UniProtKB/Swiss-Prot annotation:
Biased composition (Basic residues): 128-141, 988-1002
UniProt main location, coarse: nucleus
Positions carrying Phosphothreonine: T1259, T1264
EC number(s) stated in the UniProt entry for this protein: 3.6.4.-
Composition skew (Polar residues), residue ranges: 13-41, 1223-1236, 1285-1309
Binding-site positions, ATP: D415, E416, M417, G418, L419, G420, K421, T422
Protein name: Chromodomain helicase hrp1
Organism: Schizosaccharomyces pombe (strain 972 / ATCC 24843)
Family listed: Belongs to the SNF2/RAD54 helicase family.
Amino acid sequence: MEPEHSNYDLKNHPTSVQESTLNGSAVTDPQFGNTTNSLPSMNGLLNHENSFASQQSLSSSAFDDSEIVTSTANSTVVSSALSTPKIDDAQNSDDVRVDGTRRSSRAKRPVYRDFSYTEIDEHEIPIPKKRKSKPAPKQKKSVASDDEDAYDKRHRFSINSASGTEIRTSLRSSKGKSVNYNEQEFYDDFEDEEEEVEEQVEEEYEPIIDFVLNHRKRADAQDDDPKSSYQYLIKWQEVSHLHNTWEDYSTLSSVRGYKKVDNYIKQNIIYDREIREDPTTTFEDIEALDIERERKNMLFEEYKIVERIVASETNEEGKTEYFVKWRQLPYDNCTWEDADVIYSMAPNEVYQFLQRENSPYLPYKGVFYNTRPPYRKLEKQPSYIKGGEIRDFQLTGINWMAYLWHRNENGILADEMGLGKTVQTVCFLSYLVHSLKQHGPFLIVVPLSTVPAWQETLANWTPDLNSICYTGNTESRANIREYEFYLSTNSRKLKFNILLTTYEYILKDKQELNNIRWQYLAIDEAHRLKNSESSLYETLSQFRTANRLLITGTPLQNNLKELASLVNFLMPGKFYIRDELNFDQPNAEQERDIRDLQERLQPFILRRLKKDVEKSLPSKSERILRVELSDMQTEWYKNILTKNYRALTGHTDGRGQLSLLNIVVELKKVSNHPYLFPGAAEKWMMGRKMTREDTLRGIIMNSGKMVLLDKLLQRLKHDGHRVLIFSQMVRMLNILGEYMSLRGYNYQRLDGTIPASVRRVSIDHFNAPDSPDFVFLLSTRAGGLGINLNTADTVIIFDSDWNPQADLQAMARAHRIGQKNHVNVYRFLSKDTVEEDILERARRKMILEYAIISLGVTEKSKNSKNDKYDAQELSAILKFGASNMFKATENQKKLENMNLDDILSHAEDRDSSNDVGGASMGGEEFLKQFEVTDYKAEDLNWDDIIPEEEMERIEEEERMLAAQRAKEEERERREEEERENDEDHPSRTYKRTTKSITKRQQRREEMVREKEIRLLYRAMIKFGLVDERFDTIVKEAELQATDPKRIYSLSADMVKACDEAVERLGADDTKNKQPRKAILIEFKGVKNINAETVTLRVKDLTHLHRAYKGLDPLKQIIGYPIRSVHSWNCSWGIKEDSMLLAGINKHGFGCWQAIKNDPDLGLHDKIFLDEAKNDKESRYVPSAVHLVRRGEYLLSVVREHPDLFVVKTDQPTKRKYNRKAPTKSSTRQTTLDGSISNTKKSSRTKKKKEEETNRGDETSPEGTVGEDEVEEEPRQAEPPKRALRSNSGKAASNKRTTRNSMKTHSAMDTLTAVAALDAELDNMSNEKAKEEVDHVKSENGESVNEPNTEDLSLETEENTTVSDISPLVKNEA
């Protein structure tokens, strides 16, 4: 039984009605309410079968009272009638009804038009395609409907207006949550079955709430009950925002999704009421709430504006429908709408769609050149560039790109930030289309934050080209590929000219995008390609492109290696750039290299500076404001230094470098705000009232920078300035956002967590005329790239970036073309902290770009190392100003009495007009600003910096903490034992209740710190299990202060959890080499623990350590056949593999740099980690990735054969048991690289296998082999017998444990392999070798005259597994 429906009468309802007719009647704009003359009728153009006047009732604001009423004329959607109570409203007493629809089950096949909107001959106008007609489905009538209309069951709403006319609007969308018949041709043969399925679906359909957008109070409401006194604006599933309706709670309570209404009431109405009734709430807070609500309402109105028409289609009735993309919504929210309705709303978008469908600039209509035409300079701005007037230097940039294209060369557009690189690039693409008939497709890859700016530039400067923004989720991108890429579903002819996308979607959809041949590739912020080993670099390098352009304002950021990567991407193999130039000790040869490089690069890099080409741009000045730390900051700073004393005074190799870097990051956080550490804010608020004033005071007074910022913003606000605040740390932006709210400052925010659509709204809102926004909070990396915020004239760098170029990019957001005011930049700096030294070192980096790009290097130029900070530099940074932290100060008093004028008067002024690159002439003045006095912090010792009493205090705290932990764990252990004992006696009452157990478990979990687990995990995957290498792992993980029992427990639990995860997912077969995703688990709150790595590598490393037990790893050689390497740029054999294993055992898996630098291993010239990669031919192997693969393979061999090592001695004459038999008596030859020639050996009989095994059993009659007793005594005296006993004992053990899982070796397996090695190393004579091998065999009771060999071949492919390799020789014992 269906619920009742009531008609909603619009005659007396106060609504903004859009009355539109296609024959020239008046049109009321749905947004602004102004009446204008409508455009001419589209009936003749679209060749509709029926012309009709349409009227639509649309909401002009979020508070519009318009209703949408469902019609039943020839439709397939069953309108679920809902019993609706009367609304006791003075203005309207009619019933309110809910309208819900489902998406179309018809295929979304676009009908493409090949005609233009204007001046088209009648015979050229194609008739829209019609679907094959189907029998009309059975109609269901709504019960208790006043007019007893037959509601449309296909996919329509009927909007009844006051005049009685009706507009039919398609309600299909692109999402398929119901049955969807995607291929119409397939189902044409099964119409009867389709009708039956549709009818079944229709009977089950009911309206579903998608979102609750807004609420309003009823005029006749007597109280504030959210369920009886309010109406709610509902967005329905599968339809656009055009069909949003206002509904009562009682009406919605019977609709699917009504819980969303309850959630909305809690999160909005009740929360809003609590805020307004709170006595501590200020007027500014209420104003902020109202502004935010209004902003959301404006955004909802944006969702009703047509942004683009994607496709068109003709339904069964001959009516045209448009697939519409709505403004600010992604492609997965596109819906099918009636063409006449859309034309009345957005005639310009319809015109643009028809123009695109029959564009003269379709890619397949372009011209193909066998040879590039000669270059002709553009003397003035072409007529087809109509977006505005380009400047002379921009026209020069277009000519430069055109010159490179005619020569079939690529380049780097490296103009300083703010000079319009985006406009130049877009105009050049327009030049290719209009002047050279190169219609694309063109690919533009940009950062996500710059997408809105690029979209705006493309729409403004190239409106006649078809540009697509390829972003969004998987469904959105699928819609783009289906409707926007090709002219038809069966055609591979592209219909777009420009595709705009981001780095992330290049990686996600590289398969689809790489199938297209691109005429031009432009990459914005191209310094993302500075790492030639990154996935983005490799993916874009494989794209098929005719020409490429890199766009970056900072072509050099750190070192020459990054420049080499960019140049190699553009011109593979054409340039070789040395990245090891030392600027500290320049010489004549290096100067010649630099000048030669500059001359060679000059034609391919175009760089102009603002001061040289844009004289009208206002100036920019930078001031460094130094401020003291607060008392809370000082205390945290000292504690971090003191508690990390071991790391500060420990090793300064690669492992220590990471620890020091972590300390530097922690100190940078302290320099910003102590609230960045968990629990700091709560600790300060203890004993204080949780009032608004106390919260605000804590945020300000506990950070010196916040005190300065508070005073500075008050003055800037008073003087009418607008401010951009940049910080590296997103959590710092959270604190700043809370401060802005408490102060009542209107602000916007942009960081890496903000979606693209919200970013665009925030930027537009800030740049809008008369915008109320005072501050824009931005992260340095996400907000410092490519966006235009020139409506602000003040920039505050709250904390400096490691890379000075990132800060310059941030400043350029305001200092760019279009800026009308002088730009002030304030850089905050905490005194006597690591920030000061980092800033000074960062400044020196910029000389590198100055030298290469602008002036070249002279003997007077100075520069520090351009590589990343090493351990010594990090140690010097940490020591800078550290001693002042332990001196008594009155910083807090200074902060409370801070005088802003005094701070500004003593600020360090820095003229930033000579930013990166310096002046194009005369660089001496530029170089002088980098001449800084080095602070010789390395002369100090940490014992001199940190007072002894501080060390004693910290050590006492650590001892107390360790004792407390041990006591807690002992108590828990006893309770656990009691619980286990209690389980044996069910009648005994437990002393602990379930609640107490839960609390105890919570306390245990709280004690497990994430840092400890991560450090332990990293150490274990380097060295193995804690049980075997406790001291090494504890030292590596820096857990000396942690209770050993705790370390053992964590290690065992981690291994157990990983084993269970691998076994649970069916990945416990270690021999399976098929590619699969990593098994990542969460262990005690720590995520991304690789279970397979722990299960395999950690245990393999333990096997390796056990194999070396009692032996000198440097004197061991692999005595087992292993596969050889291929295409490595060095001689690599068994000796190198043996040393690699020894290095892994000594330094840890993955520590390739330490292994390379170890002189005892002799691998310095065989491992290539830092070699330049200018082209494929010069890439040296092995690199780190090859060593990882080789190391894992060798560890798997150790796992299979733990006795594979044999002793290597320096005196061959003493190795009587290691000589190789002459070639005549043995056809096997083993070389140092591991390759083995064919050999012959008779198969071993089953009986003799059992005899050998039985001999092993006799060694240990109890069933276990006492390997220590058997092997220890004769290890050095009689090596052959030791080997025999070891292997036979192992065979006996394997027989009892894994009898059929592993093949064992006899003594001769090892002896033959050793003999093969010795023959190659010592070049023994065949006769001498044969005698000694015969002697060894006779001692072991083996036959000398019967070699017993069989054919044996080893695979040497890279994917060969250990299990594929047969044993070397299996002789009879």
